[in-house]
Amino acid sequence: IKDPAPLATLLVDPAVLKVLHSGSEDLEVFQRWLGVLPQPLFDTQRAAALLGLGFGLGYRALVQEICAVDLPKGETCSDWLQRPLTESQCEYAGLDVTWLQRVWRELHEQCVRQDKLQWVLADGRDATSALGTEVDGFHRRIKTAWKLNRRQLGNLVAVCQWREDTARSRDKPRSWIIDD
């Protein structure tokens, strides 16, 4: 993308619903690259959980559940940071986009029927609000951090900051440096 300004404008347009699946990493990319966070936001993974389809349901499993389509998983672990993307990666990404609209439509309809649409949209607002206000709070993602004493928590904060700095300098995902 040579000029990202139109994308940034679209992401903040309140008249356009943005649909993501498990979008936390996407939100960070938008914030760092474009300086914006999308609103309104419908996260299909969170919607599926609210509808009782399963907590943390992966995209492939959700497409299988809703569309009865078995997506290939061959490119799941490929290097998505390399450029140009391979033809196989482009096809894989295209399939993701192809099925996302159908998944969204079904989940949206279920949310409306069960009176949960506002819950999903509020969850999207919460996700972007939390990210928008978090300053170097990467240690908060560690689920067991609450068990640590002050010294251990200080060490965790230092390691998380090192991981963040290293990931940025290498232009790699945090999980490739040290997983949560």
How would you describe each model-predicted region?
Residues 87-160, 172-180:
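Mixed-charge, glycine-rich, non-catalytic linkers/tails in nucleic-acid processing enzymes
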